[in-house]
């Protein structure tokens, strides 16, 4: 009889735990109509196809010193674009055999991930003069990596390279082969690199000026099987912060800022490069030009997509937490004790992958904090979105929410008076181009001068610029 009681208690406990697991933790969906902002757009520029396939655009950024925008294709090209969008020029192809990079772009997530121009790129005589950086997946696995996962399949490496142009204003890159700063051995073929970038709100003399932030995903597979994101002795699932012009790293190829959170903790088991940890796939981050807040769009596993604030030493929770909820498995999170660990930085906003607005394969993307008055409808908003569905979302930049999706609202594109998602606009363009309509958008954001907001994708080669239409409801 005692055995029966033990069995009954065990079954009840298991049933209770199971009842707390869910794949849809948000009972109320994002409103399809309330608070919708409708903005107009123009087809700003067209990036060339490669072998008949649309450009796989990942990032667009402004290089104000030379008065050009730059955009990359994941297969290797880096293009410059005049501010009027009329001239698109291949500045560099990092996959050209002369450079020895050998870009690994065989899958949708792999390739030339990101790039960043040093803030002194156009400042003659400065340490960063002519320098820019690329973060790319490479077939080459030599030299030996600086960071290894300690498991997995060793599929390829992700490499940070420094390029030095002799003349920053030249139409094409005129420098020598790049210098390698760091190399990461990847355990799996997904969730590898992320974005790299300099803080645009930092000025010369500020502690953060000229320091490069590097997003490194958890290594892939699913659920962080090697438990790397919470391991402070691992590069995976982290945001690094380095001085690319320094030399006090272990390999001597870059510097480690003294004010990094683990740089002077006296612990040999923490990496001094780490700025924040507990991230899954940090593809997009951006800074608020008004107050310097750093935001991150972090892609969730199968349940929750996240928009978070990032601060020095922050633990964003993965793989113990997915959003505000304890991570159980790839099929569910726990509803028990949400946001229950005071040591974790939880999202300011998050949304569920089961939301009716979305496709099943959701992924948070972004990111732009809009503080301009050129598009009054978007003033003081944090803009982000969902990669596959092409949904553009916003939350208020002032008075940020404290998690959940209740504060999330939509931005639609004004197409002859009709509000449409980016995917719908792409599909119409595909028909015009003679292509089959895309099944997903692969949305990314880009930033231009004076707070311009661009929408990128991998499906039609068109860069779209948002403009005011004064249409909202």
Predicted regions and their residues:
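Predominantly five- to eight-bladed beta-propeller fold
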Residues: 151-161, 227-247, 308-330, 472
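Sec-dependent signal peptide recognition
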Residues: 2-10
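Extracellular protease catalytic domains of secreted zymogens
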Residues: 294-301, 309-375, 379, 385-387, ...
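Acidic, Gly/Ser/Thr-rich repeat motifs that build Ca2+-stabilized beta-propeller blades
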Residues: 20-223, 284-286, 292-300, 360-399, ...
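N-terminal signal peptide c-region/cleavage motif recognized by signal peptidases
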Residues: 14-16
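Repeat-solenoid scaffold signature
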Residues: 268-308
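Blade-edge beta-strand/turn elements of extracellular beta-propeller
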Residues: 28-52, 86-106, 163-187, 208, ...
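Extended hydrophobic/aromatic segments used for targeting, binding, or gating
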Residues: 82, 250-252, 308-309, 315-331, ...
């Amino acid at each position: 009889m005692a055995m029966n009681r033990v069995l009954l208690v065990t079954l009840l406990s298991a049933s209770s735990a199971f009842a707390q697991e869910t794949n849809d933790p948000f009972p109320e969906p994002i409103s399809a109509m309330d608070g919708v902002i409708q903005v107009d757009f123009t087809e700003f520029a067209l990036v060339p196809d490669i072998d008949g396939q649309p450009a796989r655009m990942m990032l667009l950024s402004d290089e104000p010193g030379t008065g050009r925008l730059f955009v990359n294709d994941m297969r290797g090209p880096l293009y410059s674009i005049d501010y009027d969008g009329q001239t698109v020029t291949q500045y560099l192809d990092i996959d050209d055999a002369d450079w020895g990079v050998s870009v690994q772009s065989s899958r949708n997530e792999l390739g030339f991930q990101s790039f960043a121009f040093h803030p002194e790129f156009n400042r003659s005589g400065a340490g960063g003069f002519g320098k820019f950086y690329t973060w790319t997946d490479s077939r080459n696995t030599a030299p030996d990596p600086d960071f290894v996962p300690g498991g997995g399949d060793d599929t390829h490496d992700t490499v940070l390279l420094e390029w030095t142009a002799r003349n920053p204003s030249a139409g094409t890159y005129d420098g020598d082969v790049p210098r390698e700063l760091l190399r990461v051995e990847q355990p799996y073929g997904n969730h590898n690199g992320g974005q790299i970038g300099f803080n645009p709100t930092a000025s010369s003399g500020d502690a953060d000026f000229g320091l490069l932030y590097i997003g490194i995903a958890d290594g892939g597979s699913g659920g962080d099987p090697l438990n790397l994101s919470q391991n402070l002795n691992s590069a995976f699932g982290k945001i690094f912060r380095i001085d690319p012009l320094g030399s006090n790293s272990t390999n001597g190829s870059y510097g480690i800022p003294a004010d990094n959170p683990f740089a002077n903790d006296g612990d040999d088991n923490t990496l001094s490069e780490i700025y924040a940890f507990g991230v899954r796939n940090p593809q997009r981050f951006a800074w608020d030009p008004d107050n310097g807040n750093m935001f991150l769009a972090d892609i969730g596993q199968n349940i929750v997509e996240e928009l978070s604030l990032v601060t020095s030493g922050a633990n964003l929770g993965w793989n113990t937490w997915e959003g505000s909820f304890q991570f159980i498995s790839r099929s569910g999170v726990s509803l028990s004790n949400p946001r229950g660990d005071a040591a974790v930085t939880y999202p300011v906003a998050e949304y569920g992958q089961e939301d009716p607005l979305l496709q099943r394969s959701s992924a948070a993307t972004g990111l732009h904090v809009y503080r301009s008055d050129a598009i009054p409808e978007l003033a003081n908003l944090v803009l982000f979105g969902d990669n596959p569905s092409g949904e553009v979302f916003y939350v208020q930049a002032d008075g940020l929410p404290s998690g959940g999706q209740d504060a999330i609202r939509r931005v639609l594109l004004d197409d002859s008076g009709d509000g449409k998602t980016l995917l719908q606009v792409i599909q119409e363009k595909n028909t015009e181009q003679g292509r089959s309509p895309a099944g997903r958008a692969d949305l990314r954001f880009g930033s231009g001068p004076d707070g311009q907001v661009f929408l990128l994708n991998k499906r039609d080669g068109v860069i779209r610029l948002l403009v005011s239409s004064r249409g909202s409801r």
